[in-house]
């Protein structure tokens, strides 16, 4: 098999294994699970018929050849008997209560209407041995969850269903097909005998869940978030959702760091928790402590009667010192292999001291802007979750400066944060302290550290291939580029640029004729992270969501899965997947938590790095996102994250730091929102001081799509892109035409005024070019891919053929030669296609004009792909028009013959079309 051969069976096997290992068993009274051979199974809940493979928004828009739901997988089981009469009752009810898809982007309901479980239904099902109750939830981009029934809370109908079924069946299993954790108080109230978080497992998700329910896979997933009794128990809830300022008053005490320190009694299920069908004993010890790391050993013994895996988790309790610390902090973890009953596996876990160090943002410990280890006794806890980890060693540490840095991204708005204080009963209470304010001027720092300008030479005949082959220095190559070339390179083009793989997010690099003449290839990126989004309808593999990946605690398995995704990217000529998502689960209501991993930064970093490494091993790369503090969807373009520098570094940036330093990430995406008054897309201290100077990052930084920036103290605008250039945010994503500057950005204006210099533009261009020279695009440009591998890439199956039967034809007007089509009744839901024929009077040049609108906001992404005789001509991605009609025109080119057909493919719901015009542009010149 060649380098780009994609073994779809192995891909599916790995995805299924991840989906299974992600399942978290919270409860299993009296060995309710696994299902037993011959079990008669009653399935309740419409979610059995409406499986959520992923959440909403760009992270979930993956077209797939198939999706295996939990019900599909159940029906494939030969050793259990499904109650088909009960399923038929649901099927008939669903016909009268169809799936509600909402109105497109950001409007899909969090859940679907549920059927009431009447007494007669229970009588129908009473002969079964076990009941499976399916609960489904979704949320996503531009759509936070809410503390309401049908979202974070169960509806009355759902609660009644669980109550009645749990009373009627000796064995009741509630399966949660959700992206985020939800309220769980109903478990204590209705007492189902088993509860399983199944997450959103991608296209193989159903198979993975059934592997666990049947016992083919022993559940080994662990919670990546603390499940508290009430949403109000999370300290971030107080400020979550504010449209203007979100104060991070809880500081570093996020998730279990807060609950284990201050509120253990408010926890239902602790971080890292998850049951197995067997029992394990973990005996851990500290092996050694050196200047660089600590080494721990854990012996894991299977004391039960079923083979399975276990996760060893290592926590630290650092001395409070002057800074204050959480009572527990995860510093390492490792998953065992399959351990047979009675057998033992020894694990060695190496933990860098940098994972243990604390950042002094005030100087109270004597070393401001340093990561330090305060003097005192450090206790090690090893176990299967944060609550049950046992003390397994301790060591004394002298005061140590681990890393000396400089202040960056500190707040400018005064507020208070929490800090532990020990009372007379040896219990930690909350004390409030003032957060240190910013003392440096980032603008002065930026101008002081400007790169030296490379003198412009004009075209000397150098091509990028000469740099690639070490014949010419990169600076000499860049010296040829005019300021207009450099500005154009700053602007990525998209969405769905015709210059790269159809339906993808953006093109960048050699996107103008001038840049192409220098031998700069056009690179491509596609939305992720749970698979490749291609809005033209091209199929890709849909993967388990980010939370599911985290719950595996299996770094090696995640890496293997994403190596397959890397091969898939290469086969589709995509140079970077826009993922992994690595923001912190600060609050359970964040709509995009499904894309992200955990409330813990170390786990987030390790799982994110595994995805990056896997993709890069295959030859493509990943874009880690969103840097940083992008922790709510409400008002995501404008809400200012007011956060201490310590919390930024220890919590919200730490995972990204691990992905850069350990995963060798080469691409980063900033956020929509400001952090401490500066929009991240234009934050020099974020994009340069921290990312490049401190972490050693040498890749590209790109904005989120249609992001804004501000000059500090002023409002943000989309036109004000000069701060992005100055900050070393290399790529603005994205515009329809880089050369024409359709958004009227101010980069050229600020260049001519002297605020943006040639050296700023050259520096950013060098970053882009260095990235491209390591990309698949460069290998294609230089014909460095073997004939065998090219055949593998170009020989993929095309399953987009159109049936010509029953196509309605529209005929050209005799006078104008135009065809006007009333499109008001077109099927326009996500995944729909409209196919129609056109019959022309004249050979010649034609355009297609489409008049359309959307009620959604300007950050909505509504792709519409245009096929002409089964060839993709263009994909239009419009943003929400807030109800205003707009007309988009695309070239069809020179058309021969009379009869042809057009297909419109809707990549998202919510786009209304008024009319389609096939516009005759003239006879033109024959193209031969």
State where each predicted segment sits:
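Short beta-strand edge segments in extracellular beta-sheet folds
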Residues: 395-404
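Extracellular acidic, Ser/Thr/Pro-rich low-complexity tracts
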Residues: 302, 854-856
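Glycoside hydrolase catalytic-domain context in secreted enzymes
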Residues: 1-388, 406-849, 863-895, 899-928
